[in-house]
UniProtKB/Swiss-Prot annotation:
The species this protein was found in: Chlamydia trachomatis serovar L2 (strain ATCC VR-902B / DSM 19102 / 434/Bu)
Annotated protein name in UniProt: dCTP deaminase
InterPro entries reported in the protein's UniProt record: dCTP_deaminase, dUTPase-like_sf, dUTPase_trimeric
Family statement drawn from the similarity comment of this UniProt entry: Belongs to the dCTP deaminase family.
Gene3D superfamilies reported for this sequence: 2.70.40.10
A Pfam family assignment: DCD
Catalytic activity: dCTP + H2O + H(+) = dUTP + NH4(+)
Enzyme active site: E139 (proton donor/acceptor)
SUPFAM superfamilies: dUTPase-like (SSF51283)
The protein's annotated pathway: Pyrimidine metabolism; dUMP biosynthesis; dUMP from dCTP (dUTP route): step 1/2
Function field: Catalyzes the deamination of dCTP to dUTP.
Keyword Hydrolase annotated: yes
């Protein structure tokens, strides 16, 4: 199983719709204002995805218990904005700007960008399995004792693509994976 390079990622994005919308290079400046951005787009051996303007931030307003088998949205506040302030020692969910369609013989691993990690923000995204498609739900933990800012429409994590030596017997789509074709921020369910 080998990691895939920029030429392969570009070809799959353009010809197969693997990533939509697709930025063909690293974007570091806002195209209209010239303002510095947390980079996104194609890199040497990966693709830096962006975070959308949709966020769900954890709150304790209703004194809720977080239970992955019986999750309630009472624990979350929905925000649509160009920035999201994550409270100290708290957590937010978001979604990617990009829609992904993963080929049958490919598995991805997604790693948070170092710019955020160096600020105490930990980004977690589970692997994109063979034939999974959808917008990516992104988990962001603020491990600091201070509020932390996340910028919408800028880079948040890097996706690495690994091609298997052979196609899998059963894909995520064939297993009818529960997060297949997710459109927005998807909360946990069993």
């Amino acid at each position: 199983m080998g990691i895939k390079e920029d030429n392969w990622i570009r070809k799959m994005a353009i010809e197969e719709g693997m990533i939509e919308p697709f930025a063909d290079s690293q974007v570091k400046l806002h195209p209209e204002t010239g303002e510095k951005l947390i980079s996104y787009g194609l890199s040497s051996y990966g693709y830096d995805l962006r975070i959308s303007r949709e966020f769900k931030v954890f709150t304790n307003v209703y004194n809720s218990l977080v239970d992955p088998k019986c999750f309630t949205e009472d624990a979350l506040i929905s925000i649509v904005d160009d920035v999201c302030i994550i409270p100290p020692n708290s957590f937010a969910l978001a979604r990617s700007v990009e829609y992904f369609r993963i080929p049958r013989n490919v598995l991805t691993v997604c790693i948070g960008k170092s710019t955020y990690a160096r600020c105490g923000l930990i980004v977690n995204v589970t692997p994109f399995e063979p034939e999974w498609e959808g917008y990516v739900t992104i988990e962001i933990s603020n491990t600091t004792p201070l509020p932390a800012k996340v910028y919408a429409n800028e880079g948040i994590a890097q996706v690495l693509f690994f091609e298997g030596d052979a196609a899998c017997d059963v894909s995520y789509a064939e297993r009818q994976g529960k997060y297949q074709k997710q459109q927005g921020i998807t909360i946990p369910f069993v």
